[in-house]
Swiss-Prot record:
Organism: Shewanella piezotolerans (strain WP3 / JCM 13877)
Reactions mediated catalytically: adenosine + H2O + H(+) = inosine + NH4(+); 2'-deoxyadenosine + H2O + H(+) = 2'-deoxyinosine + NH4(+)
Keywords: Hydrolase, Metal-binding, Nucleotide metabolism, Zinc
Family recorded in the similarity comment: Belongs to the metallo-dependent hydrolases superfamily. Adenosine and AMP deaminases family. Adenosine deaminase subfamily.
Protein's name according to its UniProt entry: Adenosine deaminase
Cofactor note: Binds 1 zinc ion per subunit.
InterPro entries referenced in this protein's UniProt entry, alphabetically: A_deaminase, A_deaminase_dom, Ado/ade_deaminase, Metal_Hydrolase
Requisite cofactors: Zn(2+)
Binding-site residues, Zn(2+): 12, 14, 197, 278
Active site: 200 (proton donor)
Length: 331
């Protein structure tokens, strides 16, 4: 099977984890930023996580270098354009990219400028390539909560014009949802959809709480539900889709190996699952790689792939018109 030619949807992709290493060097030179090295292979080694990390926190260290060149409007716009371009080249037809605007304020940009620059880059890619997209605004859970509503307000003017959803990301501690109930409610009032990173590190209760307390329509990763009956049943009964990221889940030790990933069990039992990259650079992956790995490891047919593709379309935060275009590509 030609996996490259299959139409694909990626609903869980981090902007700062999907930066071209060469672009880090280029932007650093333009902006007089000192890097540890200007050697491409060395920069790449600092941006790509090991095949297996000690834990999620070690994996997250790979974001420091790209963030250093994502503090200006030009840098953010270029990197946004390039992630959509890279995805389009491998037949990703719709891409939702997430990033945390609060991490891009070190050189004086406003939150609105940060978000606007990313949207501008995406729209340039949409004009040049056969791809549609949207942004999801992430809040890093261990940062102070006093600016969360500022992010929501800054993104509100872009709702359904480049921005579609609110997310909580970063290190996962048990019981984090309770502290964000007012923020999720405020985001929904402002027109945001909701997807939450939960159950990535095995805490199934977090998935339950993200759905019950925060109104999550999708869950980032979510594999912790396999050991939490209530979360599993709620995920199914509420038709909440899981954004599974197989390569990343192995790297962060969320699962021991791809073969032990609960993907197939979820799929066979009617849990709504999707296939995603998480971080194209940090995980050294593409959607083509993810689809190939999943189809081969779990022996999925072409028909089964398109069933999963349709789940991705239906549970995307795309407009109805874009969804119709995407569904028409399913064979």
């Amino acid at each position: 099977m030609n996996y490259l030619n299959l139409p694909k949807i990626d609903l869980h992709c981090h902007l700062d984890g999907s930066v071209r290493p060469q672009s880090v060097i280029d932007i650093a030179l333009q902006q007089n930023i000192t890097l540890p090295s200007n050697d491409l292979s060395e920069i790449q080694s600092l941006m790509v996580a090991p095949d297996t990390c000690l834990n999620l926190d070690e994996y997250l260290t790979r974001f420091e270098l790209p963030l250093s060149v994502m503090q200006t409007a030009a840098g953010i716009e270029r990197i946004a354009f390039e992630v959509f371009e890279d995805a389009a080249i491998e037949n990703v037809k719709y891409l939702e990219v997430r990033f945390a605007p609060l991490l891009h304020l070190q050189s004086g940009l406003t939150l609105q400028q940060v978000i606007g620059s990313a949207v501008k880059g995406m729209k340039r890619a949409e004009a040049q390539h056969d791809i549609k997209g949207n942004f999801i605004l992430s809040i890093i859970r261990n940062m102070p909560k006093d600016r969360v509503n500022e992010v929501i307000d800054a993104g509100a003017s872009f709702i359904n014009n480049g921005v579609v959803a609110f997310d909580l990301a970063g290190s996962e501690l048990p019981g984090f949802c309770e502290g964000f109930i007012p923020h999720a409610k405020y985001a929904v009032e402002k027109g945001y959809r909701v997807t939450i990173h939960a159950g990535e590190q095995g805490v199934g209760q977090n998935v339950h709480d993200a759905i019950a307390m925060l109104g999550a329509e999708r869950i980032g990763h979510g594999i912790g539900i396999n050991a939490h009956k209530q979360a599993y049943e709620l995920t199914k009964s509420e038709s909440v889709a899981l954004e599974t990221c197989p390569t990343s889940n192995v790297q962060t030790k969320a699962v021991d190996s791809l073969s032990s990933h609960p993907f197939r069990e979820f799929y066979k039992d009617g849990v709504l699952i999707t296939i995603n990259t998480d971080n194209r650079t940090v995980s050294n992956t593409t959607m083509t790689d993810e689809v190939r790995k999943v189809m081969q490891e779990f022996d999925l047919s072409r028909e089964e792939y398109f069933e999963i593709y349709k789940v991705s379309v239906e549970h995307s935060f795309a407009s109805d018109a874009v969804k119709q275009q995407l569904l028409a590509l399913a064979e």
